[in-house]
């Protein structure tokens, strides 16, 4: 039975690497996959999913107003059946895109695996991630670690001088030079200043 999977994490956890490996596993067995990425995310090139360890694969770039259900329905009528749809950087989608992916699962019977961030640098849910948390059939946390060794669940955004930013647009495409993954405690220290408990 097809399902909508949300694989979420903070930055630098290996989500894109996992996506590329999972898609390759299908392809190695002669199955067809469709890989999607937001058109404005050109870090690895337009229509390219790239990982920090150097793996890359071509993907179909989609625009904010694109109907992903219609796109996949059209593709499914061309060539071999589609065995799975993969979406990288899912937080760049709109909530409507999430529902279109759910329709791919429910109406076309094609599994959809999405990979993305849960929260932004201010600790707020991305709209698409919020929608995925609400309607995905299965959610899987992809883990990475803070510099202290604890599980990293948050991310801070840095300016060109490496200082932590507290304000700005929710979406700002960047990589290791712009974002650092931290545990909640160290994120709080960076965003709100080192907190010292008052004596009881």
Curated annotation (Swiss-Prot):
The keyword Amino-acid biosynthesis does not apply. GO terms for molecular function: ATP binding; thymidine kinase activity; zinc ion binding. One of its GO terms (cellular component) is cytosol. Its EC number is 2.7.1.21. SUPFAM superfamilies: Glucocorticoid receptor-like (DNA-binding domain) (SSF57716), P-loop containing nucleoside triphosphate hydrolases (SSF52540). Zn(2+) binds at residues 146, 148, 183, 186. It is an enzyme of class 2 (transferase). Homotetramer. This is Thymidine kinase. It comes from Rhizobium etli (strain ATCC 51251 / DSM 11541 / JCM 21823 / NBRC 15573 / CFN 42). The gene is tdk.
């Amino acid at each position: 039975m097809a399902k909508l999977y949300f694989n979420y994490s903070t930055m630098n956890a290996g989500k894109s690497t996992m996506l590329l490996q999972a898609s390759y596993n299908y392809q190695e067995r002669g199955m067809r996959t469709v890989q999607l990425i937001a058109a404005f995310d050109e870090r690895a090139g337009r229509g390219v999913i790239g990982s920090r360890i150097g793996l890359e694969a071509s993907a179909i770039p989609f625009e904010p107003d694109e109907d992903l259900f219609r796109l996949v329905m059209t593709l499914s009528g061309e060539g071999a059946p589609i065995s799975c749809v993969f979406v990288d950087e899912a937080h760049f989608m709109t909530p409507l895109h999430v529902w279109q992916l759910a329709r791919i699962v429910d109406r076309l019977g094609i599994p959809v695996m999405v990979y993305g961030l849960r929260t932004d640098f201010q600790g707020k849910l991305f709209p698409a991630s919020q929608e995925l948390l609400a309607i995905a059939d299965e959610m899987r946390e992809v883990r990475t670690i803070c510099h202290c060794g604890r599980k990293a669940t948050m991310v801070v955004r840095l300016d060109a001088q490496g200082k932590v930013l507290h304000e700005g647009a929710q979406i700002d495409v960047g990589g290791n030079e712009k974002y650092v993954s931290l545990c909640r405690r160290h994120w709080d220290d960076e965003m709100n200043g080192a907190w010292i408990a008052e004596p009881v």
